[in-house]
Swiss-Prot record:
Catalyzes the specific phosphorylation of 1,6-anhydro-N-acetylmuramic acid (anhMurNAc) with the simultaneous cleavage of the 1,6-anhydro ring, generating MurNAc-6-P. Is required for the utilization of anhMurNAc either imported from the medium or derived from its own cell wall murein, and thus plays a role in cell wall recycling. This is Anhydro-N-acetylmuramic acid kinase. Its EC number is 2.7.1.170. It is an enzyme of class 2 (transferase). It comes from Shewanella sp. (strain ANA-3).
Length: 369
């Protein structure tokens, strides 16, 4: 059988590394061939975190970081290919998400901005790059996010089966597969790992709360939880998308200002419940019973999964590995899939999900030649 090799590159709002995946799309289902995670050097991580907040000298910093992130993404590709022992000539294209530094689709003139110069990636890998997937959807009046529901529909939809696919990265998003292959809903529910990561990084200088152990040692404060859940985003109708612009450390500190008496682990437990309650509320609005398959980093947080199960007693809950897709790499595979759709001239957005006026071929091609 002929191979159809594509590479997907993903670095999410958690900024916990660049995921690189090599995928073969020759068969009916995507086949994961090789994976690699490239750590983000601390100086680059600090620069990105700083750029995500309003500041001075932003254009100079943006330009430098755009190139630096491009070089890091290229390094991820070259290390992936070395690991897989596959030549660059065998790859049709790279699908690069880039690193989001602003996502503000609801302004009068909405925009989204991902950096990681695709020209640099193409030049340093010798492979054509397809990138800038979100801005066409925004140009068509959409949110530019989430984009993964189209991939979820293609890969996980089954006639007659109601399924929810939950992707928990920095931000959490859900795809509702109604059992009718043509009908799909999807949107960002709110914070995924972003606030629980930010709090443990601030207090304990640890990158993340492994298995939710720190959250499990605390007790949720119901008053704080109610205040956090009163954020206007949670009552917005979909299509909707969000990011660090709404849910960030500055917002968290503002919310905590009236709760100085709380223990740090109680705050962590409350933040985990914010993630779980906001997800569960939105799922229950779609359907009271069904199947839920989880992917993204949150799928590996056992405390999160237990709390979600308690809030959704009539759901059968598993990870996407039960459907043949490794939950750790699902989003990287989705961006390889988006590259394939562009290469074949096929649309990749779902107007019912993003609010765009029509379907469209997403992204632009940056030649290695």
């Amino acid at each position: 059988m002929n191979k159809a090799y594509y590479i997907g590159l993903m670095s999410g709002t958690s900024m916990d590394g660049v995921d690189a995946v090599l995928v073969d799309f020759a068969g009916e289902q995507p086949q994961l061939i090789a994976t690699h995670t490239e750590a983000i050097p601390s100086h680059l991580l600090k620069g990105l975190q700083r750029l995500c907040l309003p500041g001075n000298d932003e254009i100079n910093r943006l330009g430098r970081l755009d190139r630096s992130v491009g070089k890091l993404f290229a390094l991820a590709v070259n290390n992936l290919l070395a690991k897989a022992q596959i030549a660059k000539e065998d790859i049709i294209a790279i699908g690069s998400h880039g690193q989001t530094v602003r996502h503000m689709p609801n302004l009068e003139v909405g925009f989204t901005l991902q950096i990681g110069d695709p020209n640099t990636i193409a030049t340093e890998t010798g492979i054509d790059v397809i990138a800038d997937f979100r801005r066409k959807d925004i140009a068509l009046g959409g949110q530019g996010a989430p984009l993964v529901p189209a991939f979820h529909q293609q890969t996980f939809a089954q006639v007659g089966k109601k399924r929810v696919i939950l992707n928990i990265g920095g931000i959490a998003n859900i795809t509702y597969l109604t059992g009718n292959r043509e009908e799909v809903l999807g949107f960002d529910t709110g914070p995924g790992n972003t606030l629980i990561d930010a709090w443990i990084q601030q207090v304990k200088n640890e990158p993340y709360d492994k298995d939710g152990e720190w959250a499990a040692s605390g007790k949720t404060d119901q008053q704080l939880l109610a205040q956090l859940l009163s954020h206007p985003y949670f009552s917005l109708a979909y299509p909707k998308s969000t990011g660090r612009e709404l849910f960030n450390q500055a917002w968290l500190e503002q919310q905590l200002s009236q709760f100085n008496q709380l223990d740090e682990e109680d705050i962590q437990s409350t933040l985990l419940d914010l993630t779980c309650h906001s997800i569960a509320r939105d799922i229950l609005k779609l359907a009271p019973v069904g199947e839920l398959f989880v992917c993204g980093g949150g799928a590996f947080n056992s405390e999160l999964m237990q709390r979600l199960a308690a809030l959704l007693p009539d759901y059968h809950i598993d990870t996407t590995s039960a459907l043949g897709v490794d939950p750790k790499w699902a989003e990287g595979i989705a961006f390889a899939w988006l590259a394939m759709r562009h290469h074949l001239g096929l649309p990749a957005n779902l107007p019912a999900v993003t609010g765009a006026s029509r379907e469209a071929v997403l992204g632009g091609r940056f030649s290695a030649k």
